[in-house]
């Protein structure tokens, strides 16, 4: 068994600059469900920065950085209690399966100026994916 940990912190201003400079910023990095969540929060930049940070943290858990798969292969959502949750798709899911990762726990926090996240997973054994939350459409 192996413990995988990833953390990330991002300045909200950095996300604002990227958002202002590229009209396709959201569509390039986030799934439709994530964008719908941002719309429900009136596109508040700290929420967007938090999801960005979470995707970075998860890429560190997977050990590849974002270069190993698409940004949209990681989807941030919320469980029935409102806690952040992770859905892996495509290449990100394949990497998690190879590492035997069954579940990823995620924490996200933000202020007006920073967003931070921490992702933790246990793996190391071959996994049948039964416990990992996935999107079967991918």
From Swiss-Prot:
Its EC number is 2.7.8.7. NCBIfam families: acpS (TIGR00516), pantethn_trn (TIGR00556). Keywords: Cytoplasm, Fatty acid biosynthesis, Fatty acid metabolism, Lipid biosynthesis, Lipid metabolism, Magnesium, Metal-binding, Transferase. InterPro entries: 4-PPantetheinyl_Trfase_dom (IPR008278), 4-PPantetheinyl_Trfase_dom_sf (IPR037143), ACPS (IPR002582), Ppantetheine-prot_Trfase_dom (IPR004568). It holds the Pfam family ACPS. GO terms for molecular function: holo-[acyl-carrier-protein] synthase activity; magnesium ion binding. The lineage of its organism: Bacteria, Bacillati, Bacillota, Clostridia, Thermoanaerobacterales. It catalyses: apo-[ACP] + CoA = holo-[ACP] + adenosine 3',5'-bisphosphate + H(+). It is an enzyme of class 2 (transferase). It comes from Thermoanaerobacter pseudethanolicus (strain ATCC 33223 / 39E). GO terms for cellular component: cytoplasm. Belongs to the P-Pant transferase superfamily. AcpS family. The keyword Ribonucleoprotein does not apply. It is found in: Cytoplasm. This is Holo-[acyl-carrier-protein] synthase. It comes from the Bacteria.
